[in-house]
A protein has these predicted regions:
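Conserved oxyanion/phosphate-binding beta-strand-loop segments in alpha/beta enzyme cores
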Residues: 56-124, 214-237, 323-353
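Residue patterns forming the tRNA-binding/recognition surfaces of aminoacyl-tRNA synthetases
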Residues: 1, 7-8, 14-16, 23-25, ...
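Zinc-coordinating Cys/His ligand positions in small cysteine/histidine-rich zinc-finger domains
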Residues: 21-22, 340
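Short, surface-exposed alpha-helical recognition segments that flank or form part
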Residues: 88, 94, 104-108, 247-254, ...
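Conserved active-site neighborhood of enzyme catalytic/cofactor-binding cores
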Residues: 11, 132-138, 163, 255, ...
Length: 383
């Protein structure tokens, strides 16, 4: 909820109680956006106000009012608490150990929160559109995930790599989230269990794959990052460069100052294989060279030797951890293409084969590029 909004306690004709932002009751939903910016779809009815929806169902009365800040902390039950994933301690499939140790799971931790503002300073929950109450799903979206981490909300991530529901999701298991049949089943379930007020069609901007045209879904997965706590060292290097035009220096510093940790992994087959090996105790080891990899390898070196450090050859190599002695396999991830771009001064100047030659030519005297994207792309990765 938004702590600064006023909410009404609405009693419908069947005696059910609903909480809604007061200003949302008579709000003409999506009316302003489609008058000013977009074209409404021909033949599609305009959206009804919330007040109109309840009047058509037999009417309603307002039996009370409450401030959003007074709702924070309320506990509630949710429509899908019967699914096994909701009973997994610490969340599912990525477990929050601290919450698990406290015996917390999705089913027990539904509570009203005030998510505050986004990174632009705008309220995440607003009056007007919708109900004024937003369900936060930390396992299913970027903003929700950030709020979940900040406020310690249990994360439930339901989808696999094919956007199908995984084992812990009961009657949804194996069904593709974007299939209309799946959507209809979910809507039907909500209706049968009296969790749905109304269904309407409306224009909605939604991300699609630029190649296939398929709908995209958010999916919570573990990734690899370069910690940017050492950003000050990188920023100091900017002053060692003569920028033409001169304002390029400040532009690059602005980007570096606000840059979060750099995600360097991709869930793909093609790409530079990350030299990271994982072990059954949850530890990992970064291999620094082919020579070190050969020294640590206990299996698969003969399949890899003489080939480029890419999949599938490098994936065959298993190593023994130099400290624990555990046997590990390489992570399946490959590197972000901009990670490749950042090592151009090493890969093109023979760093691995001829250090003297590399030292002669590194760093470059002159880099020519077009603006503006390179500040957050190639210049950044080079630095």
């Amino acid at each position: 909820v938004n702590g600064n909004l006023e909410y009404v306690k609405l009693k419908s004709s069947d005696g059910s109680i609903y909480y809604l932002a007061e200003e949302n009751l008579e709000f003409a939903r999506l009316d302003k956006q489609y008058k000013e910016k977009k074209q409404w779809i021909d033949g599609l009815p305009k959206l009804k106000t919330i007040s109109q929806i309840f009047k058509e169902r037999g009417g309603y009365e307002i039996v009370g009012k409450i401030s959003g800040k007074d709702m924070v902390g309320w506990k509630y039950s949710a429509p899908f608490d019967g699914l096994d994933a909701q009973s997994e301690l610490g969340g599912y499939p990525i477990r929050n150990d601290a919450l698990a140790d406290e015996g917390k799971c999705g089913k027990t931790e539904h509570r009203v929160i005030n998510p505050g503002k986004d990174n632009l300073g705008s309220d995440i929950v607003v009056g007007g559109e919708g109900t004024g109450i937003v369900h936060m799903a930390p396992g299913c979206g970027d903003i929700d995930h950030k709020v979940g981490k900040k406020l310690n909300v249990i994360s439930i991530a339901p989808l696999d790599e094919e956007s199908k529901f995984t084992d812990k999701f009961g009657w949804l298991k194996g069904k593709k989230a974007t299939d209309q049949e799946t959507i209809d089943e979910i809507i039907g379930y909500l209706k049968e269990n009296n969790h749905l007020i109304y269904v309407e069609d409306y224009p909605h901007i939604y991300p699609h794959c630029w190649r296939s045209g398929d709908e995209l879904v958010f999916r919570l997965v573990d990734e690899w990052y370069i910690n940017m706590d050492w950003r000050d060292e990188i920023i100091s290097t900017v002053d060692d460069i003569n920028w033409i035009p001169s304002w390029g220096s400040e532009r690059e510093k602005e980007w570096l100052t606000g840059m979060g940790d750099w995600m360097i992994s991709k869930k793909r087959f093609w790409g530079l294989a990350l030299p990271i090996w994982e072990f059954e105790d949850g530890s990992f080891y970064v291999v620094g060279s082919k020579e070190e990899l050969k020294e640590l390898s206990i299996e698969g070196w003969q399949d890899f030797e003489g080939k480029s450090p890419h999949r599938p050859w490098i994936d065959k190599v298993k190593i023994k951890h130099p400290e624990t002695g555990l046997v590990g396999s390489r992570v399946e991830d490959v590197g972000n293409p901009w990670l490749d771009a950042g090592i151009v001064p090493f890969s093109t100047l023979g760093y691995n084969d001829n250090k003297n030659y590399w030292q002669k030519w590194f760093p470059a005297d002159f880099v020519v590029e077009s603006f503006p994207g390179q500040f957050r792309n190639w210049f950044y990765s080079l630095l």
